[in-house]
Regions:
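A solvent-exposed, charged loop/short amphipathic helix patch at secondary-structure junctions
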Residues: 64-82
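Active-site-adjacent betaalpha module
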Residues: 1-53, 70, 98-103, 124-243
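A short acidic, glycine-rich active-site loop
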Residues: 76-91, 126-131
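A short, N-terminal amphipathic alpha-helix
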Residues: 87-106
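Short beta-strand segments at enzyme active-site cores
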Residues: 105-112, 202
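Short catalytic/ligand-binding loop motif for oxyanion handling, primarily in non-cytosolic enzymes
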Residues: 116-119
Length: 243
């Protein structure tokens, strides 16, 4: 059954236009119609909180190695790359960072830590790394006023002073971009949700090495833990905050 038909059938207090807008995202081509019925009670208005900060998660050089090619063509040589999905997100992410910087929002860069003796929790394949592999990619160079934290595990909060900084600054809302959608982004979203922050994930500014994993995780987080929003929508909300 078409998605629109399902939406009409499950109409309640929330008008149809709001439902269609809430579900108008990249996952529409993979989510079965019955799942929209199951998750209908989660439909709501999305927004950016009044005291937001931007989290830029794991946009380091290692992710872009091998160039703008499908990951399956290059992961044998570059296991950590997200290939074309990483490169496609560069311009939208630059626009997001620029808008947040113009508006004076606190910007936190969270990146992995280089260590040749880093302890791995799994036996998955990893490529040989150098110290600059975990540096922020030049397309997103931090400004002097931005804050950069290093982490050794998936979440931006685990083993970092991030929560203390956010609390001290009175931040109540987080805008999130970076990678990977199913890994470090998701781990950070769940921790942020657990700490009580309102979370907005910018759809065009997060990515994964698997498009299926990317879409499924966005769908799941959107209905449970965060507002997945289009870049244009986020920029419009930010302009409203800056007026």
């Amino acid at each position: 059954m078409p998605i629109n038909c399902c939406l009409i059938e499950i109409r309640d207090e929330i008008d149809l236009a709001k439902k269609e807008n809430f579900e108008s995202h990249c996952w529409n081509d993979i989510v079965p119609a019955e799942d929209y019925v199951t998750y209908a009670p989660y439909v709501r208005e999305t927004y950016i909180g009044k005291a937001p900060a931007l989290l830029v998660i794991d946009l380091y050089n290692l992710v872009y190695k091998g160039g703008a090619r499908p990951p399956h063509e290059i992961t044998a040589k570059f296991p950590s790359t997200c290939g074309i999905y990483a490169h496609n997100a560069i311009k939208p992410t630059q626009s997001l960072i620029s808008a947040c910087r113009t508006g004076g929002l606190p910007i936190y860069y969270i990146c992995g830590t280089y260590s040749p003796k880093r302890v791995q929790s799994t036996q998955r394949s990893v490529s040989p790394i150098t110290e600059d592999d975990y540096d922020v990619h030049e397309a997103f160079a931090p400004s002097p006023e931005d804050i950069v934290f290093r982490k050794e595990r998936a979440s931006a909060f685990f083993g970092t002073p991030l929560i203390a900084h956010l609390t001290q600054k009175g931040i109540n809302s987080l805008i999130i971009c970076g990678e990977s959608t199913s890994g470090c982004v998701r781990a950070s979203v769940l921790d942020a949700y657990s700490y009580g922050f309102h979370i907005s994930i910018v759809e065009e500014c997060v990515f994964d090495r698997s498009i299926l994993t990317h879409k499924v995780n966005l769908f799941d987080m959107h209905h449970k833990y965060a507002d997945v929003m289009k870049l244009d929508e986020v920029l419009a909300h930010l302009k409203g905050l800056f007026v």
